[in-house]
């Protein structure tokens, strides 16, 4: 039992690997009747997989799809733990967070003016809702405007708190038994105790982007901007902390208790066998849209007891977890050289270049930008890769497999894909352009509606063409 990661730049290769993994020989003929479990990033991928599996196998049945890792996580809790009602209540979807936030804040919006004192944690957010309707003369219009603003705020809070529960509510260090978590990223632990975050340490420690080059005036300006941003951040932190501590902390503690109960059963030798009988022997993660470290840690721990197959879409076979946006690096380099010229007006070009090479090496800013399309539009995929690449060491028995076919068609799109695969920076004039090459098309549209119309026309054209293997029948 372990985690097996297969990565490829082609979705069809990942599909074939999934089919191969689902046809492992078994001595028990009834294994074929058991439900197969798949974790997919969206309903669209689920529909695509269902169609492709039907094409390859003639039928798609007895398969259970889970929308993202979180859904499978709560499925496992529900299957293993006996108190089903407790598990059901502990799982709080975003819709519940939104309406509970709406009800809490609504009580402070009934008066004609903000009823809260200036030192109340909610004063800033309630005042913002009142200000949104301050220019309206009609009382009815003001009330409708405040309700609309309150609904928008509640929607944003539900997004924030859902992300906090995934990214800001867990301890990622190995602590001794009984030792409290001191992770700076574990915000919800501090908020649960109604303790404010150390914003100075996390965000406003005055770490200049160009050490040793900023003048006194530039440092003073940065400090002034930092003070304003800090004041705004403190107001945000105050009302979010108050709302979390009052309304959602107890629910989050219950969620963490559910996780503790689950692993207590899985880790105990006497209860493990009965729990494993309620779980699938294998779960397949088909590509990822988001990958919170806490959910990856759940899969790694679960991989000690069942097979976890991760099919990861990776456009490049090279290591690119440390790449940066090419535009960002260019702007940074230009600003760096300009700061040096401002401080040393008489410096020659050779002195500027010598300083630039020494400075970038000394402060660790010599990062590669590599292929601009990948580094600019693939930041989230880069972060996912940097998390998954930790599994390549196989410390807990994880297996890693690369499937990167290098055959590409001889057109412009194939050239771009090949460069991204090998993380090669594009060179001007490296590809002979063919006027008949329509692999990449650029349409300039005057509105979003026109974009949809062009997209519809193109999809209709592509669907009407068919292929060599499956020609379109009139």
For every predicted segment, state its role.
Residues 1-474:
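Nucleic acid-machinery interaction/catalytic patches
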């Amino acid at each position: 039992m372990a985690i097996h990661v297969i990565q490829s730049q082609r979705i069809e290769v990942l599909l074939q690997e999934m089919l191969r993994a689902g046809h492992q020989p078994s001595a028990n003929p009834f294994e074929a009747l058991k439900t197969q479990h798949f974790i997919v990033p969206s309903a669209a991928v689920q529909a695509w997989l269902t169609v492709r599996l039907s094409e390859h196998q003639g039928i798609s049945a007895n398969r259970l799809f889970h929308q993202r890792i979180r859904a499978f996580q709560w499925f496992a809790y529900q299957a293993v733990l006996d108190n089903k009602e407790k598990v059901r209540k502990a799982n709080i979807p975003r819709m519940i967070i939104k309406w509970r936030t709406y009800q809490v804040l609504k009580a402070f919006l009934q008066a004609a003016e903000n009823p809260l004192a200036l030192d109340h944690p909610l004063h800033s957010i309630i005042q913002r809702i009142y200000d949104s309707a301050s220019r309206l003369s009609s009382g009815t219009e003001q009330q409708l405007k405040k309700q609309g603003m309150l609904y928008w705020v509640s929607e944003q809070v539900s997004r924030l708190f859902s992300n906090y529960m995934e990214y800001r509510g867990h301890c990622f260090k190995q602590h001794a038994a009984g030792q409290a978590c001191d992770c700076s990223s574990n915000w919800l632990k501090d908020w649960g105790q109604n303790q404010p975050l150390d914003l100075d340490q996390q965000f406003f420690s005055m770490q200049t982007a160009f050490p040793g080059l900023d003048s006194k005036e530039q440092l003073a300006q940065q400090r002034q901007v930092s003070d304003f941003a800090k004041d705004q951040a403190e107001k945000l932190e105050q009302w979010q902390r108050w709302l979390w501590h009052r309304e959602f902390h107890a629910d989050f503690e219950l969620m963490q208790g559910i996780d503790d109960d689950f692993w207590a059963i899985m880790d105990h030798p006497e209860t493990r066998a009965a729990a494993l009988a309620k779980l699938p022997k294998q779960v397949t993660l088909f590509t990822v849209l988001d990958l919170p470290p806490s959910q990856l840690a759940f899969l790694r721990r679960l991989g000690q007891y069942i097979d976890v197959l991760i099919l990861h879409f990776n456009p490049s076979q090279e290591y690119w977890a440390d790449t940066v946006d090419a535009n960002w690096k260019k702007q940074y380099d230009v600003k760096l050289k300009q700061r040096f010229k401002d401080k040393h007006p008489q410096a020659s070009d050779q002195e500027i270049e010598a300083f630039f090479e020494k400075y970038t090496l000394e402060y660790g800013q010599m990062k590669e930008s590599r292929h601009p399309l990948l580094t600019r539009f693939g930041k989230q995929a880069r972060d996912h890769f940097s998390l998954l690449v930790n599994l390549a060491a196989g410390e807990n028995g994880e297996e890693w497999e690369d499937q990167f076919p290098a055959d590409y068609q001889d057109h412009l799109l194939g050239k771009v894909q090949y460069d991204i695969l090998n993380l090669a920076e594009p060179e001007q004039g490296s590809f002979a352009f063919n006027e008949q090459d329509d692999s990449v098309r650029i349409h300039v549209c005057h509105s979003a509606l026109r974009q949809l119309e062009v997209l519809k026309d193109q999809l209709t054209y592509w669907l009407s063409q068919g292929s060599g293997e499956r020609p379109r029948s009139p």
